[in-house]
Amino acid sequence: MFYWILLALAIATEITGTLSMKWASVGNGNAGFILMLVMITLSYIFLSFAVKKIALGVAYALWEGIGILFITIFSVLLFDEALSTMKIAGLLTLVAGIVLIKSGTRKPGKPVKGAARATI
């Protein structure tokens, strides 16, 4: 459970960092760029700890996929960016992919004592 919390923190900091990049580009001052640097750095740190127990492919897909989903939603709400039918279809496809990746991931089972291993 702890590693999933780290992954959630990685996703949240990635979203914050990316949105602050946009905020900095439309505003004045360096605060947005500093916030971006800190948040994206934290995002990678959290992600690197999360992949200790979460499969890399799953963690990365969730990190990037959920990040893109929320960045798009917040970009529409905060920066008045357009959300076309094609973008909506892409986001729905992304969500379906995230669900399939997560549901297709098996937890490693306990090794059976005395189980034979196949040799080639």
Swiss-Prot record:
The keyword Transport applies. GO terms for biological process: glycine betaine transport. Keywords: Cell inner membrane, Cell membrane, Membrane, Transmembrane, Transmembrane helix, Transport. The chain crosses the membrane at residues 1-21, 31-51, 54-74, 81-101. One of its GO terms (molecular function) is choline transmembrane transporter activity. It is found in: Cell inner membrane. The keyword Cell inner membrane applies. One of its GO terms (cellular component) is plasma membrane. It is a multi-pass membrane protein. Gene3D superfamilies: 1.10.3730.20. Coiled coil: none annotated. Belongs to the drug/metabolite transporter (DMT) superfamily. Small multidrug resistance (SMR) (TC 2.A.7.1) family. MdtJ subfamily. Catalyzes the excretion of spermidine. Forms a complex with MdtI. This is Spermidine export protein MdtJ.
